[in-house]
């Protein structure tokens, strides 16, 4: 249940999901950051998410390498420049299958399906909101602590993914206008501000 302040502003998970629903075909730019003890600063991955039809999700990486991941139904295919494509069944990776189903529900604005896998909690206003997603499945919870979505109005600007293992770094993916605002000269510290709506 959303806090009183969020309810007063007319913000809840149903309202957010109704605004985020995007009929296929659709696409959006992304900038993903990945931290590692081996790197002096987080690696930035630039690319595009696409949904050519209701059953297909495509993640295209443009830099610093070229790779396309296509998820359709229960199959995932990864094709990387200079390497052959490989296809595998999502049944081998149940947590990935669950995430794919949930992402599809998010893009359809399907609150009922999303709540089958996650507990939802919202804060903020329609102009600046946050929605937390906590996995209900014990299997997924062993891999994932929480997902937090940040947005403004009908725009999903950022997704933060917190692994269950506290030793693993948070993964941040900026989307839409937040991703477009990132350049090679954007300081790492500014990415969090962009993500959270600054």
Segments the model singles out, each with a brief description of its role:
Residues 111-198:
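Gly/Pro-enriched, hydrophobic low-complexity segments
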Residues 2-29, 35-40, 190-198:
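N-terminal leader/targeting segments and the immediate start of mature chains
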Residues 21-73, 77:
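N-terminal mature ectodomain segment of secretory-pathway/periplasmic proteins
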Residues 78-104:
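Acidic/charged, solvent-exposed loop-and-adjacent secondary-structure segments enriched in E/D, K/R, S/T
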Residues 44-48, 68-70, 85-87, 146-148, ...:
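Well-ordered beta-strand positions in beta-sheet-rich domains
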Residues 54, 64, 81-83, 154, ...:
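Glycine-centered tight beta-turn/hairpin loop motif at sheet-sheet or coil-to-beta transitions
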Residues 32-34, 61-65, 73-75, 82, ...:
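A mature extracytoplasmic/lumenal domain signature
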Residues 56-57, 76, 85, 129, ...:
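Hydrophobic residues embedded in beta-strands of well-ordered beta-sheets
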